[in-house]
C-alpha cells in the first residue's frame, strides 16, 4: 500500500489550518502549534491517521462494497471526481440531494428515470413527440445527469462515505450518522471531528493537500479491489479442480476388486 509521508504532506501545505479565532476546540488534539494567528496541524498525526483510514478503505473495497466520495467545493470538484472514477467509486460533486442516503429509494427512482428517458431515444418514441416536449425531456435528462449521473451505478446504500470538508457537507455527514454508515473525512481546524469515524486532520481547502491524501486512500482502495479479483480467480480455480475431481471415475482398490471376485459365483 502506498504510504503517505510527513514531507509529502508538508510540501502539499496540509499543515495549514484556519485562523485561531475560527477554530473548533474539539480539534485541539490534532493541532501542533499556532503561528501568526493560524493553527498548524500535526502532520505526524495526519500521516498516521491517513494510513489507518486507507487500510479500512482497502478492506471495504476488498469486500466488494462501494464508498461514496463527497465534495461540493468548487476548487475540489474535479480532483475528487477524478480520484473516485479512478477506482470505480460513486461521487457527489454538485449540490447534495437532500435524502440522498436517508431517502435512498426516491433517489434511485430519479436515477431510473434517466434510463427511461434514454430508452425513449432508442425505441423511436421521440419521433412522435413535439419539439417542445423533446426539449423539455432533454433538459430534464441533463439536469438529472448533472446531479445524479455520478451515482447511477450505486444500486444500494454505500458502505462508507469519504467527505472533504465536514462543515460544508454536514448534511451528508448527518445522514450517514443516522444510518450508521462509517464516515471518513479530511477535517480542518474549524470543524467538529466528533461525528467522524475516521478523521484525517488536514487542510481541506488546498487542492494539493486534498490530492495527496486522496492519492493514498485511492491507492489502498485499488489494492483492495485487485486483491478481491485475485481471490475470486483462485476460488474459481479451486472450485473447478474440485468439480473435475468429482467427475473423474473412481478407481477401485485392490482389496475392493478381490472382494468382488470372491463374491462372484464359481462356474461348475
Predicted regions and their residues:
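Ribosome large-subunit tunnel/peptidyl-transferase-proximal elements
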Residues: 1-232
Amino acid at each position: 500500500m502506498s504510504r503517505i509521508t510527513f514531507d509529502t504532506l508538508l510540501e502539499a501545505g496540509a499543515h495549514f489550518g484556519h485562523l485561531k479565532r475560527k477554530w473548533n476546540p474539539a480539534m485541539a488534539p490534532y493541532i501542533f502549534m499556532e503561528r501568526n494567528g493560524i493553527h498548524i496541524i500535526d502532520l505526524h498525526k495526519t500521516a498516521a491517521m491517513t494510513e489507518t483510514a486507507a487500510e479500512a478503505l482497502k478492506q471495504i473495497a476488498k469486500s466488494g462494497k462501494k464508498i461514496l466520495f463527497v465534495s461540493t467545493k468548487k476548487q475540489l470538484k474535479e480532483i475528487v471526481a477524478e480520484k473516485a472514477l479512478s477506482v470505480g467509486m460513486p461521487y457527489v460533486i454538485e449540490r447534495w440531494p437532500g435524502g440522498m442516503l436517508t431517502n435512498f429509494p426516491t433517489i434511485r427512482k430519479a436515477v431510473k428515470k434517466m434510463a427511461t428517458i434514454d430508452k425513449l431515444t432508442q425505441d423511436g418514441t421521440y419521433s412522435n413527440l413535439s419539439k417542445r416536449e423533446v426539449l423539455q425531456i432533454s433538459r430534464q435528462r441533463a439536469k438529472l445527469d448533472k446531479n445524479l449521473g455520478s451515482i447511477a451505478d450505486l444500486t444500494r446504500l454505500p458502505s462508507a462515505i469519504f467527505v472533504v470538508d465536514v462543515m460544508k457537507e454536514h448534511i451528508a455527514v448527518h445522514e450517514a450518522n443516522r444510518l450508521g454508515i462509517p464516515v471518513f473525512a479530511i477535517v480542518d481546524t474549524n470543524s467538529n471531528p466528533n461525528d467522524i469515524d475516521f478523521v484525517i486532520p488536514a487542510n481541506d481547502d488546498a487542492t494539493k493537500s486534498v490530492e495527496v491524501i486522496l492519492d493514498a486512500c485511492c491507492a489502498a482502495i485499488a489494492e483492495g479491489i485487485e486483491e478481491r479479483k485475485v481471490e475470486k480467480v483462485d476460488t474459481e480455480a479451486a472450485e473447478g479442480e474440485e468439480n473435475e475431481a468429482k467427475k473423474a471415475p473412481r478407481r477401485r482398490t485392490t482389496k475392493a476388486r478381490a472382494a468382488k471376485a470372491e463374491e462372484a459365483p464359481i462356474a461348475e
